[in-house]
Regions:
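Residues within well-ordered beta-strands of beta-sheet-rich folds
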Residues: 115-117, 175-179, 283-287, 314-318, ...
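Residues that flank catalytic or metal-binding motifs in active/ligand-binding sites
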Residues: 64-66, 112, 174, 280, ...
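Glycine-rich strand-loop-strand elements at beta-sheet edges
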Residues: 288-376, 410-442, 449-451, 459-462, ...
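Short, structured beta-strand segments at or near domain termini in extracellular proteins/domains
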Residues: 371, 514-529
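Compositionally biased low-complexity segments at domain edges in trafficked proteins
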Residues: 142-186, 255-262, 335, 353-363, ...
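Short loop/turn segments at secondary-structure transitions that flank enzyme active sites
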Residues: 22, 74-76, 120-124, 184, ...
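Sec-type signal peptide cleavage vicinity
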Residues: 2-262, 271-282, 287, 320
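Acidic, Ser/Thr/Pro
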Residues: 262-312, 320, 333, 381-386, ...
């Protein structure tokens, strides 16, 4: 067995920097040989503490403590991976252009291939590049330079089995320097971003970071003519797609990435706000909440019925940067239970309570709450706070109201189906005889002015034992019902949109097909509307 202690001279290749225009990834020119390696340190050499750095200009140096992995074939024809001794200050030449690594090899086979992988952490146990290390990154220049800035040399052992005296490391990765901008590209929002996910069609990179104003550095595999998708998370969620771009190894790409808002606001029993990140047009989709079921059976089969689905309303609306939206997402109506207190709870934001059952009979499901969006703090819907004022024949929206998606009605026993929320008029509820013609769902002119849905009627001994479903929030009917139809499914509310300034308003009864509580989705549309 022969142990060799060999010092090798290794040179780094260069990462050339070139600026790109917003969202552009552009080709780079070949490196200038005069700038193959430039020294970059964070402290004086006299301190004997040398920190390797990849600078914003894309220049690389060696640092004390670094190692390379050496992969070779031994005389038994086995592949062997070893790591060099850690660099000392004396091993690094002035300027950081070269470094001497001491490597111990056992029985190397002469005139066979040898590979250097730099840094050693980028080599797996079998001596292959550990590219999976790129999948999750920290986004800082320091962490990338120390752990992920993968370079490689492939050569041949001498006829005596010695390492080549000199080697030139070739960079294997592209490095992207991302600055995250708002949709119009006029405001830097990098300081709000805590997570960036990049997909190039084949590979996925996830960058988790503490939000700060520094650019986000990402080491990436070279690709040719690839399509990229980006998602960023911070105060809000953003997305972007970029088509047909190339990343070349050994290049640094400064990229200003203008990203578009794509934010979902889920239900809370409280007012929520969103600050508009860029001036322009946005699509708002509001989903009303589902009504509760008059059943303990999740399927709502037989004599029991699930609540009606909430409505879906959408509009395209223009906002200015910094403007605040006030968002109220309706709560799902509560499911009924047995007994005198068995009516389902009213869904938050205007749903009606389900009627109680008589004695041990089951109650009606609670009505689903409405969902609405406004540019002023108009509050959530209650019995004392409606979204509209004035007469029923000509109601006036409160200042700032943009969009309402009504809630669905609560279900009732004996196959009394609930009405779906939404549409120009809310869906009918049916009674125990299957008759829905005696009264319809709420409409803009025949309703409670965007107010709370009516509570369901409780059962009694003379007419029916089961409670009725609560009405959905929104423009819910307040018409009286005949006593003979006291057990009925709750009516769905109707929806509304501000069409004087808003564009492309649409509403669909029961459009919240996934059911559950209300929500709002706000996405960037563009700087103009056709």
């Amino acid at each position: 067995m022969k142990n060799l202690y060999i010092s090798i001279l290794v040179l780094t290749a260069v990462l050339m920097a070139a600026c790109s225009s917003d969202d552009e990834i552009v080709s780079k020119q070949p490196a200038n040989n005069d700038n193959v390696v430039t020294q970059t340190t964070t402290v004086d050499f006299e301190d004997a503490v040398i920190t390797r750095a990849l600078t914003d200009a894309g220049l690389k140096t060696f640092a004390v403590g670094e190692k390379i992995a050496v992969v070779y074939t031994n005389t038994s024809n086995a592949t062997v991976k070893v790591e060099s001794a850690a660099l000392t200050a004396a091993d690094i030449t002035p300027g950081g252009k070269t470094a001497k690594f001491k490597v111990t090899m056992t029985d190397p086979k002469a005139s066979t291939s040898v590979t250097y992988i730099y840094p050693a952490a980028m080599a797996d146990a079998n001596g292959s590049p550990k590219l999976t290390a790129l999948d999750t990154q920290g986004g800082t220049l320091a962490s990338l330079a120390s752990n992920l800035d993968y370079a490689q040399f492939t050569g041949t052992l001498t006829s005596e089995g010695a390492l080549p005296e000199t080697a030139l490391l070739a960079n294997q990765l592209a490095v992207c320097k991302f600055t995250i901008m708002n949709s119009t590209g006029d405001t830097d929002i990098t300081n709000t971003i805590t997570k960036l996910t990049i997909i190039d069609g084949t590979n996925t990179y996830t960058i988790n970071r503490i939000a700060d104003a520094n650019p986000i550095f990402v080491a990436m595999r070279p690709v040719n003519n690839a399509n990229f998708s980006f998602t960023a998370t911070g105060n809000y969620n953003y997305e972007k797609t970029v088509s047909s771009k190339t990343l070349a190894a050994s290049d640094l790409y400064p990229i200003n990435l203008a990203m578009n808002l794509n934010q979902t606001i889920s239900h809370k029993e409280a007012e929520q706000t969103l600050t508009i990140p860029a001036t322009g047009w946005y699509t708002i989709q509001a989903y009303g909440a589902e009504g509760g079921a008059s059943t303990t059976n999740a399927g709502g089969t037989g004599n029991s019925k699930l609540g009606g689905k909430g409505g879906l309303s959408s509009i395209v609306y223009q906002f200015t940067q910094g403007q605040t939206l006030y968002i109220y997402c309706g709560g799902k109506g509560g499911n009924a239970s047995l007994g005198t207190n068995g009516g389902g709870a009213a869904g938050w934001n205007g749903g009606g309570k389900g009627g109680d059952g008589y004695n041990s009979s089951i109650g009606g499901g609670g009505g689903g709450g409405a969902t609405h969006v406004a540019t002023s703090q108009i509050g959530n819907i209650t019995n004392s706070n409606s979204l509209f004022t004035g007469e029923a024949s000509s109601p006036t929206a409160k200042s700032g109201l943009i969009l309402v998606a009504a809630g669905g009605g609560g279900g009732a026993y004996k196959s009394c189906a609930a009405g779906a929320g939404g549409g120009a008029s809310g869906g009918h509820g049916t009674n125990a005889q299957g008759n829905d013609s005696y009264s319809g769902g709420g409409t803009l002119s025949t309703g409670s002015h965007g107010g709370a849905g009516r509570d369901g009627t409780s059962g009694n001994a003379s007419l029916t034992y089961s409670g009725s479903g609560g009405h959905g929030g929104g423009f819910t009917t307040v018409a009286s019902l005949s006593d003979q139809y006291q057990s009925y499914g709750g009516f769905g509310g109707s929806s509304w949109g501000e069409t004087t300034n808003g564009k492309s308003y649409a509403t669909t009864a029961g459009g919240a097909t996934d059911g559950g509580p209300g929500k709002v989705i706000i996405t960037w549309y563009g700087t103009s509307h056709p």
